[in-house]
């Protein structure tokens, strides 16, 4: 099995650099739209499982609706999410792991 993992931060923290131009709701909507695009690119490749790791329930709901595997993460730095996915992939004896940012 090969895994592509998509870490996505909590929507309340998404796209903060755009705060001068976009409201918190607009930034969250943008982050979800970008996740949808990344999921479009990652899902459906034979031999690859797509995982989404996030502390945000809304993100995980979008991922589950798209039939990606969801991995609930305790909110923290990106490195923590990647280490969590690395451990899970190793437990499943994955032959490859690709990390693709959710945005």
Where are each of the predicted segments found?
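A short, N-terminal amphipathic alpha-helix
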Residues: 29-48
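Short phosphate-binding loop-to-helix
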Residues: 62-98
């Amino acid at each position: 099995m090969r895994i592509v993992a998509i870490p996505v931060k909590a929507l309340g923290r998404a796209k903060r650099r755009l705060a001068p131009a976009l409201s918190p709701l607009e930034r969250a909507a943008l982050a979800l739209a970008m996740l949808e695009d990344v999921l479009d690119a990652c899902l459906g490749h034979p031999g690859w499982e797509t995982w989404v790791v996030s502390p945000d329930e809304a993100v995980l709901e979008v991922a589950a609706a798209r039939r990606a595997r969801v991995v609930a993460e305790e909110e923290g730095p990106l490195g923590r999410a990647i280490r969590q996915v690395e451990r899970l992939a190793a437990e499943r004896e994955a032959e490859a792991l690709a990390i693709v940012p959710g945005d």
